[in-house]
């Protein structure tokens, strides 16, 4: 999940006026390794952090690592490690003042990087954009690589647009006028990338909303994919399930979308659950026209059908031992308050200090044989009970990843609960429920930036490729501006960021699967 940009006073350019290029081992056959300082620092004893690639750096082959790295996925690889990294970039101004035309935007639309890493060191051997800016997708957030173990006959990587804007899909994306391009449509779709062929396409039937991630759940012999609405208008978020008879049917956009609904009508939103309470529910079918329609239609349908309302669903990860058990983050919202008239939560005015400032990790248990038949929702971690400005609880959980023993949780404090600490990575022990901070973002390159403004985003267990306890993580350094250019009333910016290899003792295990992945995040 990506935050709105900070005031201009905080946006300090890097040392060079153009793109910063830091070279280390650039001419070595072992690959390129950044010499820039790490944007993440260890907290737990024994944690090791190695920065691999920093935004703005150019490889010998000409590839330049673009800004706002987010979702990470790891391919099968061979002698080397194949890594995919989303870029949560957008040429749509964010924020934007229509009255004055003043806004901030990125240099590119969303893109997908394919990197080849040295298995021994993590150094970058090659890089390329396999989904380019010219595809006109916006704000790719988290990602997930679905494989044979998830009921797919072809490896499909899901990218997820966290956006609501109307954009041209050909020509210039924004503004979406005929003079700029064609094929205008609302963003907020899931994009499927065929790893073998390199083809990619939109899967409209997976719903149009602010997608954080689309995660395939193993054990059903056919595609079962969960996704959540990382809405900009929280609290108004839902949990969706997409089912297809085969990966070929999914690729043809012929699957079906479902939404989670509580069996207890009075327990229909985030605020109705607390403590050790749980609620049974099921996934109900979304009409195809609604699923493939615009975001307002899906939101209106969910309200009319009393679909369970979360505040802001972020990333999703399944339990490695029992994959029908699924964990997902909800970032919370201080302005979320009860509305007696609708029996739903609503957003209060700016400055509201409601009861849900920090967020939660939810747990949903699906039926082992038929995920549509029944599901039980409960709270795994409730950070809201810690109250405001409490450094000892999780603040805005965003991206998550599981190993056989633990759940890794990345924070994105954004504009909530800032000033206490930089964004952290927590480890939750699934066997005994203990929580500990293992690493945190290092904002020392911009000391004037409020603590918590940067975030660590994509996280993926990389232990099968880099050894026990290894993870790939990236950082979004939103106020570390590598490049800035004024074009009329718009300011184009290249925000800083970094890809890192992190080793966490007992955090990842050599026998864990690592093709699953990470959100603003962010996101992520």
Segments predicted by a language model, with ranges:
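Bacterial N-terminal signal peptides that target proteins for export
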Residues: 1-10
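Sequence/structural signature of beta-propeller domains
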Residues: 24-516, 522-524
